[in-house]
Regions:
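Active-site acidic/histidine proton-transfer and metal-coordination neighborhood
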Residues: 22-35, 60-63, 128-234, 244
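Histidine-acidic metal/acid-base catalytic patches
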Residues: 2-46, 53, 57-72, 77-92, ...
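Catalytic domains of carbohydrate-active enzymes, especially glycoside hydrolases
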Residues: 87-106
């Protein structure tokens, strides 16, 4: 398991423009109910067939066009399918506004395409603020990320509690508060948010779960944020991880409305596409975000199990409420 977002999957050979356009054509036929589309033409499934036909007729309307949810693509999930410039093209094509967690060296490419990085990397998730031994390295990386975001006008920097390493939860929380207080004043000065991500510790599959991660419950992370006591200290509300560890996703969105600074998506189980092969019903969750007045970004962070452009088209459409 990587301890840093700088360790990204290797990229395949870049796609040609023709192949990218071919993928676009394929994605235009994707329906809002995922794998059902693969069965839709079946004569013994007339309801699905009708839905699929309607989706194909209205394919041009399936991008993010309503403007209520500002959508982003999380770079590490799709880096092996497209090079960075191509991924930016995909984001624009889908109506997304950001490609996030990318290497800052690629940020000029974001600007070229009129995109932002909704949230930036800092330190890794294994060695975090719950252990004072790592405060210095975390602080240095967070400072550097804040500076980069301030220069480009990007809003958020990611941060993590770190793994338990036999540290009691109450001690880990106190250490986090102490560590974040060392950097939050700088974030305030630079007008950049620091977003603490809650991760699941139940799934023992690389990048689908993080056994040993201390900040594995929403309320635990929110309590740390409250004790830091800054409007620049926020929660990265990852719907996939919250569903696995806590459930009650909409209730938690409403309860923690004042603290949510960024949102991630994925289907559960499997951190897969947002389709009918997983259990999370995304449209009402997106509507709940709109209802609480959330104006931040929603990052699509699933690991494709099929054509990535078709899966992204479907996910972006489903979240466009």
């Amino acid at each position: 398991m990587s301890d840093s977002f700088s360790s990204l999957p290797d990229r395949d050979e870049p796609l040609s423009r023709r192949r990218l356009l071919e993928g676009t054509a394929l994605a235009a036929g994707a329906v809002a109910w995922g794998a059902t589309a693969n069965r839709a033409a079946s004569a013994d499934d007339p309801v699905a067939a009708k839905r699929n036909a309607a989706a194909k007729r209205n394919a041009a309307d399936k991008a993010a066009t309503k403007g209520n949810i500002h959508q982003s693509l999380v770079e590490w999930c799709y880096a092996k399918h497209w090079n960075f410039d191509e991924l930016c093209q995909v984001a624009k094509q889908l109506g997304c506004e950001s490609v996030e967690l990318a290497d800052p060296k690629d940020w000029p490419t974001l600007k070229k395409h009129g995109l932002v990085s909704a949230i930036a990397r800092s330190h890794g998730f294994e060695k975090g603020m719950n252990n004072p031994d790592y405060h210095e390295i975390c602080t240095d990386k967070i400072h550097a990320a804040i500076d980069a975001c301030a220069e480009y006008g990007f809003p958020n920097v990611i941060t993590f509690t770190g793994f338990r390493e036999d540290i009691p939860d109450d001690v880990g929380a106190k250490n986090c508060v102490d560590g974040f207080k060392k950097v939050i004043g700088y974030a305030e000065k630079k007008k950049v948010n620091l977003c603490l991500e809650m991760l699941n510790s139940r799934v023992d599959i690389e990048m689908k779960g993080h056994p040993g991660y201390q900040g594995d419950h929403t309320d635990y992370c929110v309590e740390i944020i409250k004790q830091v006591g800054s409007p620049r200290m926020k929660l990265l509300f990852d719907i996939y991880h919250v569903q696995i560890m806590d459930g009650d996703v909409i209730t938690r969105i409403r309860r923690h409305a004042d603290y949510i600074g960024h949102v991630h998506t994925a289907g559960n189980p499997g951190r897969r596409e947002l389709d009918d092969q997983q259990e999370i019903n995304y449209p009402p969750i997106m509507r709940a975000l709109v209802e609480i007045g959330y104006t931040g970004y929603v990052g699509q962070e699933f690991i494709p199990t099929r054509d990535p452009l078709a899966g992204l088209t479907q996910a972006v459409a489903w979240c466009d409420v």
